[in-house]
Amino acid sequence: MPPRLVRKALNTYHHGDLRDALVQAAFQEAERGGPEAINISALAKKLGVSQPAPYRHFADREALLEAVTAEAFRQFNVILRELIDKPSKQSKLSRFAQATLAFGLQRNGIYRLMFASRTMACAPKGSELHKAAMETLALLIESLEAPAVGLLRERQAMKMWASLHGVVMLAEQGLLTGQAAGGVSREELVEDMVQEAKLALSVAMKAAERGAH
């Protein structure tokens, strides 16, 4: 971009769009280095605004992290929705699980922002981040393709989410190779988890139905 256009873009930050610019710039930093790479002072310098300017939009770093994490979940949800709705011989749960594995490894900085920091856990109920994260969970529950029987779907969804997170974090650390992974690929391991989850849910639902009669 020519320098003259850059200066014009930076000047507009004082007229309302600095918030979006901060979120996008912070997102890029997280993409490269995870949540720890996000620094408000560095972002202000990068965007060419005064050090106090970001605080007109975000009370502190945590508030900025919350906005960036919400955006990450929204982008992730778009990916998941497209995959779940796309006709395929794979089950919806398999598509969800494999997409999560790929996202976690290929975009690990963003994944760690979403799942390996305290930001999501501290998000107030009803906040943009909370709503975006709950949409991810809803997509996982939908991908189970099972009727509602008590809270069995939700419980199995949380088990699956926890298992997937474990695989991503172990794989990211290089701990799922060779004999440590039983000689199977990460994708095969995740597919095993998918099949076991579907079987466990089916057994639990049949037991619940028998107990109801």
Where are these regions (language model features)?
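N-terminal intrinsically disordered/low-complexity leader segments
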Residues: M1-D17, S202-H213
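Amphipathic alpha-helical packing segments from all-alpha helical-bundle domains
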Residues: C122-A148, E154-M158, V184-S202
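Amphipathic alpha-helical linker/stalk segments
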Residues: A70-R95, K125, H130-E142, G150
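Short linear capping/connector segments at secondary-structure termini
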Residues: R81-E82, M114-C122, T177-A181
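Helix-turn-helix
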Residues: A21, A25, E29-A63, A67
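Amphipathic C-terminal alpha-helical segment
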Residues: A162-A180, E196-R210
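Helical hydrophobic small-molecule/effector-binding pocket
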Residues: S94-A116, W161-E172
